[in-house]
Structures are given as structure tokens and as C-alpha cells.
Amino acid sequence: MVSLELALHFCMNAGRFSTMDDQQKQPLALLGNTGLLNLPKTAFLSSRKVSPEAVLRCCAWAAAQRDAGRCVISGFHSALERDVLRLLLKGVQPVVLVLARRLYSPQTLEREHADLKRALDDGRLLLVSTSSAGRANASSTIQRNRFIVDQADEIVVGSLSPAGSLAPLIARADESGKRITRLDSNPDSSRTL
């Protein structure tokens, strides 16, 4: 477990986005096991629209990550991402949940997110807030997704809409040499970008 002093140092210094304009940089807010940031992490991102076949592949992938104990980082915001989170929380592997809004209050965690509270208490969850906004918006969502991609060692894409906000981010990650796996492709032509 990382010390509180180191976590605060991360928030004040290293926790600023290197990929954004100065006006968009904000310190991070962290709750949970900050040591998870030191683990190899696989990002899971998905557009809202997804085929039933891709949903099945994503659920199988999530179960495999859970069973292997791999750390997954995501915003877990789209319906598919929330399904993946539910599967992951049934295991004991580490999870980093990145919010595009301010952190949940302790009362909200207790009342509405008992599964997250249990994972926090077990030391296998880190909540990261990349925005102080009360609700996620288009700008804070892009900011969150950039943070996820920057923190990840590899990226798994459940579904990618060519016109969506994820497409340019995934293209940029591909250009930077990150390993990207698409689960929404035909299994016979499934490829790693």
C-alpha cells in the first residue's frame, strides 16, 4: 500500500495530465488502494453501441481477467463497461475505477454502491476522479478516457464507434505503440492493432 504522503504527492504533481492543454489540467482525487497505480493495468473501453456478439466476447474477456487476477482500469460508464465491472467485482483482482465527476461521498458509497465499498474495504479498488464536476459531461469524459489510456499498459476495446469520441483516442494510443485489442471484430478476423 502506498503511503498517504506519496498519494498526495501523486495528486499534486504526477497526477496532472501530460496530454492536455494547461487549462484542462486538474489534480486527481483518489480513494482506495493507491498502490494499484503501480500494477500493470489493462484498460477496458467501449462505445455505447455494441453488438450482442461483442457483449458475449467482452463478458468472457472480463471473466478471464477476473480469474487471472489482472488489474483492469476503466470508467465503467457505458452499459457494457458496467456489466464488465459487475463481473470483475465478483472476483478478488484489483480494479481502478476512473470517474469523470467528483468522488462519491462516503454516504453515497454506503447507500448506493455496496459492491464498491466492499472492494474498497478489501483493498482491491481505487477510485480516481479526474474532474471536480458534479456530473460527467463531454469534456470530463474525454479527460477521464485520456487518463485511462495514459495509465494503461494495454487497451481492450469492447466496441468502437468510428464517429465517437473514443475513436481518435484509440488511434492516438495505437500511434504511440500501445497494444490494442478489439473485441467487437469478427472472431475470424479478430486482430490486435
Locations of regions flagged by a protein language model:
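Glycine-biased, small-residue-rich flexible motifs in mid-sequence functional cores and linkers
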Residues: F10-M12, R16-L193
